[in-house]
Amino acid sequence: MTAIKELKAVARPRAGKGAARAERRAGRVPAVIYGEKQEPVTISLNFREINKTIYAGHFLTTLFEIDVDGTKHRVIPRDYQLDVVKDFPLHVDFLRVSQGATVTVEVPVHFLNQEASPALKAGGTLNVVAHAVELECPAESIPASVEVDLTGAAYGDTFHLSGIKLPAGVTWAGHGDDTLATVVAPSGQADAAAEDAAEAAKA
């Protein structure tokens, strides 16, 4: 689970493209806080701080407390824009999150213990179908990732959502029993198996 992190911001009295450009020239990143049936609050963040925070990882699944000139806002990032050439942040959107609220987030899928799979050690391939999945969870308990244990995985094994144990209070968001990955034999072995099956069918 990711811990609540703190950010400092200042109120941005003017909105619009011109005001946003002025903030960037001053070394700040424009942002907005919205949601919870309250008026949006336009803010700006220190460029170095928010750039480092974004590239530290798990940004969109981290709960933040933003101090805006002494007023604290509990939020989760919903989107951010990067410069298409230099990849530095241009704008960030934050969603207000009340105490005990449930949020929908996308988290990465991590495949563990590939070295403990006989099939993968013998040259098989892990065919990853889903690199990320959506979860519904308490804002205070967002998993950093979903983990799939490949220990003992053999050729033809398929890993589904239903086989993954989630933390208490966390559920899949709008999924059926989707496939996450399959273990595929090397092409030569797969071709040989297909030929054997065809010969057996003729017999």
UniProtKB/Swiss-Prot annotation:
Outline what the protein does: This is one of the proteins that binds to the 5S RNA in the ribosome where it forms part of the central protuberance.
Alphabetized, the UniProt keywords read: Ribonucleoprotein, Ribosomal protein, RNA-binding, rRNA-binding
What organism, scientifically named, is this protein from?
Answer: Xanthobacter autotrophicus (strain ATCC BAA-1158 / Py2)
Keyword Nuclease assigned to the entry: answer is no
* One term under GO cellular component: cytosolic large ribosomal subunit
Q: Which Pfam families does the entry link to?
A: Ribosomal_L25p, Ribosomal_TL5_C
Kindly provide the name given to this protein in its UniProt entry: Large ribosomal subunit protein bL25
Looking up HAMAP family in the UniProt record yields: Ribosomal_bL25_CTC
What does the sequence similarity comment in the record state about its family?
Belongs to the bacterial ribosomal protein bL25 family. CTC subfamily.
* Record-linked Gene3D superfamilies: Ribosomal protein L25, beta domain, Ribosomal Protein L25, Chain P
Q: Name one GO molecular function term.
A: structural constituent of ribosome
